[in-house]
Amino acid sequence: MLGFKNFLKEQVEVESILKYYPSPREVKYIRSVRHKLIMKNPDMKPIGDDKLHVTLAGGPWWKKMSSKFKDVKFDDPNFQLEFEEPKKVESSGKVSWYMKVKQQRQLKDYVTDLLQSNPNPKRVFHVSIANKTGKVGDSVANV
């Protein structure tokens, strides 16, 4: 069950990356898919509900520009995210499972509106749901 804290959290937050935290409804769906995935792949560990996120912007451009957005409260997307079926990705010794956001164009336009720029034009918006350790930093970043 989601803690009360999750209902108070902004959905878009400026951190070392610009993150979108899934809504409680989205988390519920992701959790059910993740549970089935872990049952079929017991070597994978789930990423905790409170760590689930979609990276909206990151990389060198974001590192340079993020301080300009530190105190900005961004509007949340005005659409519910939907996700594709989970896929496995491997890179540099890391293995993770992710779910791609179905509304790639809509989310790209949303980020461009927020930042008045598209810092990662080739970004594939996704949420990592499981990896070898369950630690979010151990997921493959770019799918």
Regions found by a protein language model. Give the residues of each.
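Histidine-dependent nucleotide/RNA phosphoesterase domain, centered on the 2H-phosphoesterase fold
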Residues: Q11-V143
